[in-house]
């Protein structure tokens, strides 16, 4: 909202809303007062309590803030210019030995500097389904941030969640499922902060498309940012879920998003900031704007916003003036400053932390101090992370692994490395369907990060060919290349691009599909690798008899080629699973294929109605009984696994609602009480060792037929059997009760499914609550 509304004014506000909302549907809306009341006001902004592990940090912070002048408090709340390459800076307070803060992009590696690594993207981590690996990636990636003097890592991403198939930033997040995203964001936050680098989990909340994400001008008239309109139940059960896991892990900051939520801008929305984040979830850190996402002054502060980036025109001295005239309580400013300083103490950045921005030159091409962020100890994690995010979805006639080929033919624009590797790689002012000039290892925008090197597929293949005495022919520019008929295999490389600022033009492109079909027409063993920054439909050629193997290679980071060769030659066994659903045709995504566009009467105030509720991705496909090309959770291996021995413990009989308790970070602590345990046995029935992702889905009464509620990735040697266990807590088994405003256990029969994917579930059972 553009104005601050207190609880006392709620009745009048809602009355106004009821009048406005009765306006004729064909009457163009020209004022945002029409929407007042759609996002309920929640005031005042709750003060941080220093609960749990935050107690010591809050005690120090309150003592620190008590010594500040009003101007010094204000300076903590907004970014300032600094002679460094940080994405944003908070000014120092030298007299109290506070050196300031450097905050920098992004969740997949440090951007805009040198001597750092390009890590597998969030989507790639999601495809690995590996919690331990996600944590190790976070630890080592954050260590690079620390060495460079970055206090706050602007990530990880769990918004967007992937509601819109063509959304431009889906690749930065982990998955289209809240449980998988939540499990991985927990490990990422916990891992990064274990080395003293604060995370800024983003984009809070409902930032599900890039189209109209910011206000803009249309024929000289301002068009507001898109409003994501959602009900309370869907908010909790889908989009808030992974943010709750991030808060539970202790995320030091949360970035509010550009879009509007129920027609109130995300960074001045008192319901989402004061109500959900700070009250219900017990968030102890600070809420930071996305860059340029501040659209109100004092109203934003009262709504729960704590920090503006990269600078502000509406706060500054206006905050102290507002306190003087009573528009804002002095306690609100104290709380803003306390939350920021408490997070600094919570990360132990007051002791032995590099100077903010020490390794972040403002100009990489001017003389600057060499600060090495990389470390040799991260090599294994970089490579393993790159390997495990590849998903093998087709492997007819055991085309893979390759078997001592004498001749390989390599085709496709995605096989080669870039012609130049520079600062701010992949920041484009548009979104092409493909990156046609080189292999794709990261998406575009602020999530794109600098690489120490790029190991392209063609380079890695030729290194292996040298070792094996294999001949390699290649044509990486032609759409209809010639093929030597004696070749053992044709390796075709294509990609699917996505970037911040733009939604994708489609889920496939004609040029790449034509290339695959042309090669397959001439080559009986065509193996396709797709570096995809999101869902890529393959219906044009997936059933071609000469397309023998297909790999969704996602965005593996700088070790792209090296990782791929490990898989192609069988030194590594594919273990990735799809973190999204691949449809047979794009139209199967229905209304969630494209972003929402402005329509009459809301042309000046674009609306995106989340009226599908929780039914996105596999939930939607299950509900409509649509057969997917490759379902959520699907992925092949060079071995095979059998499932048996399903066991379900006697559930702990529990009250419908969680017992009352003081809110901790993450919410009511009883949400994490275990109710029931499920276990199963997995046997490797093949000839080689492999890793399997065992997946648990639960059918909650009165909910979707199946929802992911557990997964474990286990290594199993050939012929061996291992057991997996899934502990189900109260939140896992609850639905959101809108009237009671509580998580509610349902009375009835819960269905249990365990297996290889969301639609390959050989073990079934049930229990009753």
UniProtKB/Swiss-Prot annotation:
Its EC number is 3.2.1.21. It is found in: Secreted. It catalyses: Hydrolysis of terminal, non-reducing beta-D-glucosyl residues with release of beta-D-glucose. Residues 1-22 form the signal peptide. Transmembrane segments: none annotated. One of its GO terms (molecular function) is beta-glucosidase activity. Pathway: Glycan metabolism; cellulose degradation. One of its GO terms (biological process) is cellulose catabolic process. Glycans are attached at residues 28, 75, 262, 318, 325, 396, 437, 510, 546, 625. InterPro entries: Cellulose_deg_GH3 (IPR050288), Fn3-like (IPR026891), Glyco_hydro_3_C (IPR002772), Glyco_hydro_3_C_sf (IPR036881), Glyco_hydro_3_N (IPR001764), Glyco_hydro_3_N_sf (IPR036962), Glycoside_hydrolase_SF (IPR017853), Ig-like_fold (IPR013783). Belongs to the glycosyl hydrolase 3 family. This is Probable beta-glucosidase M.
């Amino acid at each position: 909202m553009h104005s601050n509304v207190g609880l006392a004014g709620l009745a009048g506000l809602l009355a106004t809303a009821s009048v406005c909302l009765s306006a004729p549907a064909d009457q163009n809306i020209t004022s945002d007062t029409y929407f007042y009341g759609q996002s309920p006001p929640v005031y005042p902004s709750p003060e941080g309590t220093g609960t749990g592990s935050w107690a010591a940090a809050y005690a120090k912070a309150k003592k620190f803030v008590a010594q500040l002048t009003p101007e010094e408090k204000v300076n903590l709340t907004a970014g300032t210019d600094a002679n460094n390459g940080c994405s944003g800076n908070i000014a120092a307070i030298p007299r109290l030995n506070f050196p300031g803060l450097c905050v920098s992009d992004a969740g997949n590696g440090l951007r805009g500097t040198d001597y750092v690594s390009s890590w597998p993207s969030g989507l790639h981590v999601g495809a690995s389904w590996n919690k331990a690996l996600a944590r190790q990636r976070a630890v080592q990636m954050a260590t690079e941030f620390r060495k460079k003097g970055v206090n706050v890592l602007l990530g990880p991403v769990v918004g967007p969640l992937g509601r819109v198939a063509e959304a431009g930033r889906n690749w930065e997040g982990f998955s289209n499922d809240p449980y998988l995203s939540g499990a991985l964001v927990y490990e990422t936050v916990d891992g990064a902060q274990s080395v003293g680098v604060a995370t800024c989990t983003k984009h809070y909340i409902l930032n599900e498309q890039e189209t109209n994400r910011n206000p803009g001008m249309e024929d000289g008239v301002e068009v507001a940012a898109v409003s994501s309109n959602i009900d309370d139940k869907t908010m909790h059960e889908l989009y808030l879920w992974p943010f709750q896991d991030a808060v539970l892990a202790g995320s030091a900051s949360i970035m509010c998003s550009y879009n509007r939520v129920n027609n109130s801008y995300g960074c001045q929305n008192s319901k989402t900031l004061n109500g959900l984040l700070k009250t219900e979830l017990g968030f102890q850190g600070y809420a930071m704007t996305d860059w340029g996402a501040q659209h109100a002054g004092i109203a934003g502060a009262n709504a729960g916003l704590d920090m503006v980036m990269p600078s502000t025109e509406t706060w500054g001295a206006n905050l102290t003036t507002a306190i003087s005239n009573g528009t804002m309580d002095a306690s609100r400013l104290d709380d803003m400053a306390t939350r920021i300083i408490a997070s600094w103490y919570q990360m132990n950045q007051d002791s032995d932390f590099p100077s903010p921005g020490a390794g972040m030159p403002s100009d990489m091409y001017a003389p600057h101090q060499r600060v090495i962020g990389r470390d040799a100890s991260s090599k294994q994690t970089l490579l393993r992370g790159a390997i495990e995010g590849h998903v093998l979805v087709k492997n007819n006639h055991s085309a893979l692994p390759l078997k001592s080929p004498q001749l390989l033919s390599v085709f496709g624009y995605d096989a080669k490395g870039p012609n130049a590797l520079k600062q701010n790689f992949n920041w484009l002012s548009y979104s092409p369907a493909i990156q046609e000039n080189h292999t794709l290892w990261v998406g575009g925008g602020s999530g794109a990060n600098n690489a120490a090197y790029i190991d392209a597929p063609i380079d890695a293949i030729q290194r292996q060919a040298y070792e094996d005495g294999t001949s390699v022919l290649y044509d990486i520019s032609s759409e209809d290349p010639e093929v030597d008929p004696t070749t053992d295999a044709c390796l075709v490389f294509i990609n699917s691009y996505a970037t911040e600022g733009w939604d994708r033009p489609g889920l496939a492109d004609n040029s790449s599909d034509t290339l695959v079909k042309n090669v397959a027409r001439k080559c009986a063993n065509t193996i396709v690798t797709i570096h995809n920054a999101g869902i890529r439909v393959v219906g044009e050629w997936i059933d071609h008899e000469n397309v023998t193997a297909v790999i969704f290679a996602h965005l593996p980071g700088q070790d792209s080629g090296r990782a791929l060769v490990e898989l192609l030659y069988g030194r590594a066994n594919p273990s990735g699973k799809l973190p999204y659903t691949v449809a047979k045709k794009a139209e199967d995504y229905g209304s969630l294929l494209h972003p929402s566009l402005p329509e009459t009467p809301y042309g000046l105030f674009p609306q995106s109605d989340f009226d599908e509720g929780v039914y996105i991705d596999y939930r939607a496909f299950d509900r409509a009984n649509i057969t997917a090309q490759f379902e959520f959770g699907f992925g092949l291996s060079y071995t095979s696994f059998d499932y048996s021995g399903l066991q379900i413990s006697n559930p702990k009989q529990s009250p419908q609602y969680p017992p009352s308790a003081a809110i901790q970070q993450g919410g009511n602590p009883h949400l994490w009480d275990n109710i029931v345990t499920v276990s199963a046995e997995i046997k490797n029935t093949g000839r080689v060792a492999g890793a399997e992702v065992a997946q648990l889905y639960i059918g909650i009464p009165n909910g979707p037929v199946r929802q992911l509620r557990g997964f474990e990735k286990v290594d199993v040697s050939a012929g061996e059997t291992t057991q997996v266990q899934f502990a189900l807590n109260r939140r896992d088994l609850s639905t959101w009760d809108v009237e009671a405003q509580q998580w509610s256990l349902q009375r009835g029969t819960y269905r249990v499914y365990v297996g290889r994917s969301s639609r390959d579930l050989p073990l079934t059972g049930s229990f009753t609550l």
